[in-house]
Design a protein with these regions (language model features):
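Central antiparallel beta-sheet cores of small beta-barrel/beta-sandwich binding domains
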Residues: 19, 25-27, 31-93, 100-101
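Short, solvent-exposed mixed-charge patches
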Residues: 131-132
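Sec-dependent N-terminal signal peptides
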Residues: 2-12
Length: 132
Protein backbone atom coordinates (compact mmCIF):
# COMPACT_ATOMS: atom_id res chain seq x y z
CA UNK A 1 0.00 0.00 0.00
CA UNK A 2 2.85 2.42 0.74
CA UNK A 3 4.15 1.95 -2.82
CA UNK A 4 0.75 2.92 -4.22
CA UNK A 5 0.57 5.94 -1.91
CA UNK A 6 4.08 7.01 -2.93
CA UNK A 7 3.18 6.73 -6.61
CA UNK A 8 0.02 8.77 -6.12
CA UNK A 9 1.86 11.48 -4.19
CA UNK A 10 4.59 11.69 -6.82
CA UNK A 11 2.07 11.85 -9.65
CA UNK A 12 0.13 14.64 -7.99
CA UNK A 13 3.17 16.72 -6.99
CA UNK A 14 2.97 20.21 -8.53
CA UNK A 15 5.74 21.74 -10.63
CA UNK A 16 6.87 23.45 -7.43
CA UNK A 17 8.33 20.06 -6.49
CA UNK A 18 11.13 20.70 -8.98
CA UNK A 19 11.15 24.50 -9.14
CA UNK A 20 13.85 26.12 -7.04
CA UNK A 21 17.59 25.95 -6.49
CA UNK A 22 19.45 22.65 -6.75
CA UNK A 23 22.99 21.65 -5.82
CA UNK A 24 24.46 19.50 -8.59
CA UNK A 25 25.74 16.00 -7.79
CA UNK A 26 29.38 17.10 -8.04
CA UNK A 27 28.64 20.08 -5.75
CA UNK A 28 30.21 22.41 -8.33
CA UNK A 29 27.17 24.58 -9.09
CA UNK A 30 23.66 25.59 -8.13
CA UNK A 31 21.05 25.35 -10.88
CA UNK A 32 17.83 27.37 -10.62
CA UNK A 33 14.84 25.53 -12.13
CA UNK A 34 11.68 27.41 -12.99
CA UNK A 35 8.93 27.96 -15.50
CA UNK A 36 9.84 29.06 -19.02
CA UNK A 37 6.43 29.64 -20.55
CA UNK A 38 4.69 26.29 -20.91
CA UNK A 39 7.88 24.36 -20.12
CA UNK A 40 10.35 23.98 -17.29
CA UNK A 41 13.97 25.06 -17.65
CA UNK A 42 17.04 25.60 -15.51
CA UNK A 43 20.11 27.82 -15.60
CA UNK A 44 23.32 28.00 -13.61
CA UNK A 45 22.65 30.36 -10.70
CA UNK A 46 26.03 30.08 -9.01
CA UNK A 47 29.41 28.39 -9.49
CA UNK A 48 30.70 26.85 -6.26
CA UNK A 49 33.89 25.21 -7.53
CA UNK A 50 36.97 27.36 -7.01
CA UNK A 51 40.48 27.38 -8.36
CA UNK A 52 42.54 28.56 -11.31
CA UNK A 53 41.51 25.61 -13.50
CA UNK A 54 37.78 26.09 -12.94
CA UNK A 55 36.36 27.77 -16.06
CA UNK A 56 33.98 30.71 -15.67
CA UNK A 57 32.89 30.61 -19.31
CA UNK A 58 31.47 27.92 -21.60
CA UNK A 59 34.95 26.88 -22.83
CA UNK A 60 33.91 23.36 -23.90
CA UNK A 61 31.04 24.45 -26.15
CA UNK A 62 31.39 22.92 -29.64
CA UNK A 63 30.48 26.31 -31.13
CA UNK A 64 33.58 28.55 -30.81
CA UNK A 65 31.42 31.69 -30.86
CA UNK A 66 29.72 30.58 -27.60
CA UNK A 67 32.85 29.72 -25.62
CA UNK A 68 33.14 33.18 -24.08
CA UNK A 69 29.61 33.24 -22.61
CA UNK A 70 29.56 33.13 -18.80
CA UNK A 71 28.50 29.94 -17.04
CA UNK A 72 26.37 31.86 -14.54
CA UNK A 73 23.02 32.32 -16.28
CA UNK A 74 23.78 29.57 -18.80
CA UNK A 75 20.69 27.46 -19.65
CA UNK A 76 21.50 23.84 -18.79
CA UNK A 77 17.98 22.35 -18.62
CA UNK A 78 15.72 23.21 -21.56
CA UNK A 79 12.17 22.39 -22.65
CA UNK A 80 10.81 19.97 -20.05
CA UNK A 81 7.09 19.13 -20.02
CA UNK A 82 5.11 17.40 -17.28
CA UNK A 83 4.59 13.67 -17.88
CA UNK A 84 2.95 12.12 -14.83
CA UNK A 85 5.45 12.13 -11.97
CA UNK A 86 8.34 13.16 -14.24
CA UNK A 87 9.35 16.04 -16.47
CA UNK A 88 10.37 14.73 -19.89
CA UNK A 89 11.06 15.83 -23.45
CA UNK A 90 13.80 18.20 -22.40
CA UNK A 91 17.50 18.53 -22.96
CA UNK A 92 20.37 18.84 -20.50
CA UNK A 93 23.57 20.67 -21.44
CA UNK A 94 26.78 19.53 -19.75
CA UNK A 95 29.14 22.51 -19.68
CA UNK A 96 32.03 20.25 -18.61
CA UNK A 97 31.92 18.41 -21.95
CA UNK A 98 29.96 20.75 -24.21
CA UNK A 99 27.46 17.99 -24.94
CA UNK A 100 23.67 18.10 -24.88
CA UNK A 101 21.59 15.07 -23.90
CA UNK A 102 17.92 14.10 -24.01
CA UNK A 103 16.87 14.26 -20.38
CA UNK A 104 14.17 13.78 -17.79
CA UNK A 105 13.70 15.12 -14.27
CA UNK A 106 12.21 12.97 -11.52
CA UNK A 107 11.38 14.39 -8.08
CA UNK A 108 12.10 11.89 -5.30
CA UNK A 109 10.14 11.36 -2.09
CA UNK A 110 13.18 12.39 -0.02
CA UNK A 111 13.09 15.85 -1.62
CA UNK A 112 15.99 15.25 -4.00
CA UNK A 113 15.80 15.38 -7.79
CA UNK A 114 17.05 12.74 -10.20
CA UNK A 115 18.37 14.22 -13.43
CA UNK A 116 18.79 11.58 -16.14
CA UNK A 117 20.54 12.23 -19.44
CA UNK A 118 20.47 9.80 -22.37
CA UNK A 119 22.16 9.18 -25.69
CA UNK A 120 20.11 6.63 -27.63
CA UNK A 121 19.40 3.94 -25.03
CA UNK A 122 22.38 4.66 -22.75
CA UNK A 123 21.38 6.77 -19.75
CA UNK A 124 23.15 8.14 -16.70
CA UNK A 125 21.49 9.67 -13.65
CA UNK A 126 22.56 12.15 -11.01
CA UNK A 127 20.85 13.01 -7.75
CA UNK A 128 20.63 16.74 -7.05
CA UNK A 129 19.90 18.20 -3.61
CA UNK A 130 17.54 21.11 -2.98
CA UNK A 131 19.18 24.28 -1.67
CA UNK A 132 17.10 26.01 1.01
Amino acid sequence: MSVVLAALLAASAPSAAVEGDWLTADRAAIVRIGSCGAHLCGAVARILARGPKVPRTDVHNPDPTLRSRPLVGLPVLIGFARDGAQWTGGRAYDAKTGRTYKARLTPNLDGSLTVTGCILFLCKSQRWTRVH
